[in-house]
């Protein structure tokens, strides 16, 4: 089997160093690899909040090392974990003003994440109350709409995802990505994925591998091929 060209590829979900756990690349190393293969864009992500400032510095690095015409741009976003105050419209707005391209719901602070990791889900960030999203999340949705960026569902449960997506659509959000629905923490059924696409016109993110814990990873490629056929 020959090599697959990565020219023009866009990757919207890459974790890099610095982080609280070791990643394969730091921001500059990832940019080096991206330029080498002719990638168009990468969105870097951290569970620790902001990556917009890191993306800016990386783009400056790329210009200095490779010149102005690489065709590659690195972007950042905001993850609404407890480290930035959870569902924090002010923090999100600052990130958007700095150029954030994706705003993620909670990851490690999500109730679903804590439950799947054997921790107390009650300590997670509340997104839905009495069947509706919390008011501050509506404010975040309006910002996402106004800046025309992407909402990522991150590590929320399938049940939360339906409520959140409907509210986001009602608020005028146009670009919604269901973050790695096949990951065992999210664990969204095929039927739910089909429903979300059919009813709300969302994008299903497909990751090539999933973290199984303890440093172990599982290839998603065979399962994702079947999921793509089904959806």
List where the protein language model places each region.
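Glycine-rich anion/phosphate-binding loops
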Residues: 83-90, 221
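Active-site-adjacent C-terminal substructures of enzyme catalytic domains
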Residues: 103, 136, 143, 163-164, ...
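Divalent metal-dependent hydrolysis catalytic cores, especially in the metallo-beta-lactamase
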Residues: 11, 17, 29-53, 70-82, ...
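Active-site gating loops and adjacent loop-to-helix segments of metal-dependent hydrolytic enzymes
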Residues: 37, 100, 104-136, 203
């Amino acid at each position: 089997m020959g090599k697959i060209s990565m020219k023009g590829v866009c990757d919207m979900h890459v974790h890099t160093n610095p982080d609280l756990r070791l990643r394969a690349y730091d921001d500059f190393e990832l940019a080096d690899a991206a330029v080498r293969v002719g990638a168009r864009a990468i969105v870097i992500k951290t569970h620790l909040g902001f990556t917009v400032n890191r993306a800016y510095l990386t783009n400056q690095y790329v210009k200095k090392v490779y010149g102005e015409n690489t065709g590659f741009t690195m972007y950042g976003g905001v993850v609404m974990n407890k480290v930035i105050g959870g569902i924090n419209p002010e923090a999100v707005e600052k990130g958007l003003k700095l150029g954030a391209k994706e705003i993620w719901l909670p990851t490690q602070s999500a109730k679903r994440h804590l439950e799947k990791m054997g921790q107390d889900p009650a300590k997670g960030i509340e997104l839905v109350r009495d069947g509706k999203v919390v008011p501050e999340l509506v404010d975040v949705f309006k910002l996402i709409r106004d800046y025309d960026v992407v909402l990522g569902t991150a590590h929320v449960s399938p049940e939360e995802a339906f409520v959140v997506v409907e509210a986001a659509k009602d608020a005028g959000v146009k670009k919604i990505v269901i973050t790695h629905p096949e990951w065992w923490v999210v664990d969204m059924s095929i039927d739910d994925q089909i429903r979300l696409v059919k009813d709300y016109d969302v994008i299903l993110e497909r990751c090539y591998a999933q973290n199984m814990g303890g440093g172990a990873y599982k290839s998603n490629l065979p399962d994702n091929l079947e999921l793509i056929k089904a959806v």
